[in-house]
Amino acid sequence: MSATRANKDIFTLFDKKGQGAIAKDSLGDYLRAIGYNPTNQLVQDIINADSSLRDASSLTLDQITGLIEVNEKELDATTKAKTEDFVKAFQVFDKESTGKVSVGDLRYMLTGLGEKLTDAEVDELLKGVEVDSNGEIDYKKFIEDVLRQ
């Protein structure tokens, strides 16, 4: 049960107090930082499946590494999303098949559908996104940029 050097370095960034543990509610952010893309529900399910962690307030790197190993199949599946899977979702809002959606529609999708983001999270995500003169974005480019992060 050994974490990679990169995972240890990222863990250190999350362990702001240098106590060898991170807050349990930071697990999802940590998993995303090391390359997985779990939903909040999956993160909660992973924690709840381990009875020894349900009441814990923090997690050590060894505990997290163990959780990753036990849930490797589910976590790996979260990284398999392809651009085309997301494009299909955006096409529902692209009624004229232009490859673009309005910023308003994008904001609606991100704050109102699926795993909802807050307005502040959407604002952060939209920083640096190229918006054309009609107030629209190229959603394929947007998806690729987000998946690359």
From Swiss-Prot:
Record SMART domains: EFh
GO BP: any one term: regulation of cytokinesis
Residues binding Ca(2+) 1: D15
PANTHER family noted in UniProt: CALMODULIN LIKE 3, MYOSIN LIGHT CHAIN 1, 3
CDD domains: EFh
Source taxon at top rank: Eukaryota
Gene: MLC1
Binding partners and assembly: Interacts with MYO1, MYO2 and IQG1 by binding to their IQ domains. Interacts with SEC4.
Domain called EF-hand: residue spans: 2-37, 81-116, 117-149
Result after altering F93A: In MLC1-1; causes a defect in septum formation
Subcellular location: Bud neck; Bud tip
Binding locations of Ca(2+) 2: D94, T98, K100, D105
Keywords per UniProt: Calcium, Cell cycle, Cell division, Isopeptide bond, Metal-binding, Motor protein, Myosin, Repeat, Ubl conjugation
Main location: other
Disulfide bonds: none
Lineage: Eukaryota, Fungi, Dikarya, Ascomycota, Saccharomycotina
Record-listed cross-link Glycyl lysine isopeptide (Lys-Gly) (interchain with G-Cter in ubiquitin), residues: K116
Any single GO CC term annotated in Swiss-Prot or TrEMBL for this entry: myosin II complex
GO molecular function: calcium ion binding; identical protein binding; myosin II heavy chain binding; myosin V binding
UniProt name for this protein: Myosin light chain 1
Pfam family for this entry, one: EF-hand_7
List of residues binding Ca(2+) 3: D123, K127, D132
